[in-house]
Amino acid sequence: MNPLIIKLGGVLLDSDEALERLFTALDSYRAEHRCPLLIVHGGGCLVDELMHKLSLPVVKKNGLRVTPADQIAIITGALAGTANKTLLAWAKKHAINAVGLCLGDGDSVNVTPLDPALGHVGRAHPGSPVLLTTLLEAGYLPIISSIGLTHDGELMNVNADQAATALAATLGADLILLSDISGILDGKGQRIAEMTAQKAEQLIEQGIITDGMIVKVNAALDAARTLGRPVDIASWRHAEQLPALFNGVAIGTRILA
């Protein structure tokens, strides 16, 4: 059975109620299925909040956070520290054996600089499956932040959707991207059940898919092509539907290769 990577995003980390529902759903799924699970997360809302408190600017370019050298340590602390350990704490509350990691642990994901104009922002590439496979076989739930390391040891902020895609390629895993929205919406605000690359290009050209959603859709399309199977984009808000989603039932938008 392929491992399942669940990428968490949006304002989920700000809501105890949402985290309680999510981990209850994870607990329920793990009790009934033997499928190995991994969590990949960002934490943009936590980073934005911290930047505001420190009176530091938040700049995004094409949906990606610009990360100057003087901000990467702060962002690493927010993502690999606060966000990661918050999720680890929720796993512990639910008696789930979990391990908090970043992309650089065990060279699970290789990272290269994406664009000098973005600063410490990295591009994720498949890495070594050895560490994560060892943890999964021992029954652990890896919880992985989207902070990576270059071969030169430079800290890099990686878009969490792209990080999850690289991990899925590393492990041959299925992938679900959970966010604030119920899926990709058309121009009338209605959920699109299935999405192809051609349809995505049309909606981007029409200005219906914009900013961070372009990054998410492109990451999902890339994952579907790389893995040779569909990738789901769905909301964490409907916790009662999550066990079905984890079991392969589409509740959001299914991205087709």
Curated annotation (Swiss-Prot):
Catalytic activity, as annotated: N-acetyl-L-glutamate + ATP = N-acetyl-L-glutamyl 5-phosphate + ADP
Binding residue positions for substrate: 43-44, 65, 157
Domain of life: Bacteria
Function per UniProt: Catalyzes the ATP-dependent phosphorylation of N-acetyl-L-glutamate.
A GO CC annotation given for this chain: cytoplasm
Gene Ontology biological-process annotations: arginine biosynthetic process via ornithine; L-arginine biosynthetic process
Keyword Cytoplasm: yes
This protein's name: Acetylglutamate kinase
Main location: cytoplasm
The protein's assembly and partners: Homodimer.
Organism listed in the record: Sodalis glossinidius (strain morsitans)
Stated family: Belongs to the acetylglutamate kinase family. ArgB subfamily.
